[in-house]
Amino acid sequence: MITTLDTQPQEWMESNPNAFHTIAACTFDNIEHIEYWINKLVPKNRNGEFVKWSSGKRNVRYRDIFINNCIKYVNEIDFYVNCISAKAGEMSWIAWSFYMQNQNHIRQEKDRKGRNNLVFQITEEKSIAFPVLRAGFLIWYYYALKYLSDVKKIKGKFLSDYFASDELGPGEGKALGAAFVNFLLKQSNLDIQISLPTNERFKNLDRISDYFCGWVNSIRNLSATKENIEKFDLLSNKNPMIDGFIYIPLLTIIDENGTDITSEIMRKVIEGSKINGENEQN
């Protein structure tokens, strides 16, 4: 099995805590299986080049072509699609709850821009620091992959594009977001790791997950047309291999007296996000 991963809107955290982020995970038998369906579903431009969800001035027409192709071949689609979504404000909560559960290995620091960072101790000599909301996204990404492994029973190779804030690698300090997610997966003894594309063929394998990710994220953020919402519902109802859902891991926080303070901390974090208008794009 090989699963291609795509995210919208990459990993940039917006000031709106109600803005949705979506991961699309499309699982195929092998590379040839992916390429067969890319040729069947994904539109091309006038030069015969495959077009991405957000590409070009004619992106609405291209999107409609992809969506209509999915409806046309709904009964033939034999790969899994799992589109997982959560709000930016909920990711802030995930970051803080994860911090409070793991304070022996995580500390808080201000970076040179004055942002509050979470610093994760990887080894005695090595640590990785991320702004809180980016940390929340990466931790949620880890939990989403864990869900795919534990609940959906998806195994094999997971192929991801570089995360938006990652510096291209290989090398020390490169692709830190992907490396951090892999670290969390390894610590959980999950037999899955994210792989990054190493050649042009691999870079082009995410075309279907790119479209499903954009499609579902537009539905979550209420920017999709009524027709496109109905078509995704039709697709997922007619083909059980296609699923779209909102997923927030159930994390609990217990204080030193053994009291569950999860609801109290969640309320404070979400209210703080709304008041402060957290924005970590820069």
Which residues does each PLM region occupy?
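Phosphate-ester processing/binding pockets and catalytic centers
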Residues: 2-282
